[in-house]
């Protein structure tokens, strides 16, 4: 899976929602970590 670059966790919400269906995400070391639905 291609890494999603980010400057903050809110940069990840939309791309992670597109990828996993839920916007649960954090920005870690300038890349998004998508957690999917919990």
From Swiss-Prot:
Record's keyword annotation contains Disulfide bond: yes
Annotated site, Aromatic residue of the functional dyad, important for the interaction with Kv1.2/KCNA2 channel, chain positions: 35
Domain of life: Eukaryota
Residues of the site described as Basic residue of the functional dyad, important for the interaction with Kv1.2/KCNA2 channel: 26
Subcellular location: Secreted
InterPro entries named in the record: Scorpion_toxin-like_sf, Scorpion_toxinS_K_inh
SUPFAM superfamilies: Scorpion toxin-like (SSF57095)
UniProt record similarity statement: Belongs to the short scorpion toxin superfamily. Potassium channel inhibitor family. Alpha-KTx 06 subfamily.
Miscellaneous: Negative results: has no effect on voltage-gated potassium channel Kv1.1/KCNA1 and Kv1.3/KCNA3.
Domain remark in the UniProt entry: Has the structural arrangement of an alpha-helix connected to a beta-sheet by disulfide bonds (CSalpha/beta).
Protein's name in the database: Potassium channel toxin alpha-KTx 6.4
Organism of origin: Pandinus imperator
């Amino acid at each position: 899976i291609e890494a999603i670059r980010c400057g903050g966790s809110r940069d990840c919400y939309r791309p992670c929602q597109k990828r996993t269906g839920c916007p649960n995400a954090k920005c870690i070391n300038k890349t998004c970590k998508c957690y999917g639905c919990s």
